[in-house]
Amino acid sequence: MSILDEFRSFIAKGNVMDMAVGIIIGAAFTGIVSSLVADLINPVIGLITGGIDFSNVFVNLGDGDYTSLAAAREAGAPVFAYGAFITAVINFLIIAWVVFLLVKMVNRVKETALHKSPPAAKAEPAGPTQEQLLAEIRVLLKKASA
């Protein structure tokens, strides 16, 4: 089998396709979570903390005075951008929470499927007991010997 054939076989497997779909959905989900944090959660946190925008919170480690993180980075100033880190932590916590809920839901579905009893098989009609069979054999033997 050539390397090309092995590669085709590898790609055709269901696990690889499932992984590809997961990566694509994950990338889209990351955009949704980033928007959720930047556009909805951070403004509420900023309102509670007196207008602080975490995405723009930084400490300038060099000389100069910059009004925004973007201006400091554009000037090449060394900055400690802990606000961006806080935003990344919030993103991570939201993604981890959603993944936890999804795993919990899948486990519940699996558990329900495992505990579901299989449908009862049709009861087969009861045949004659051993005593009844022996009695029939005895009758047949008596008829045959007579």
Curated annotation (Swiss-Prot):
Keywords: Cell inner membrane, Cell membrane, Ion channel, Ion transport, Membrane, Transmembrane, Transmembrane helix, Transport. It is found in: Cell inner membrane. The chain crosses the membrane at residues 21-41, 44-64, 83-103. PROSITE patterns: MSCL (PS01327). Its main location: membrane. One of its GO terms (molecular function) is mechanosensitive monoatomic ion channel activity. One of its GO terms (cellular component) is plasma membrane. Pfam families: MscL. It is a multi-pass membrane protein. NCBIfam families: mscL (TIGR00220), PRK00567.1-4 (NF001843), PRK13952.1 (NF010557). Channel that opens in response to stretch forces in the membrane lipid bilayer. May participate in the regulation of osmotic pressure changes within the cell. Homopentamer. Belongs to the MscL family. HAMAP family: MscL (MF_00115). This is Large-conductance mechanosensitive channel.
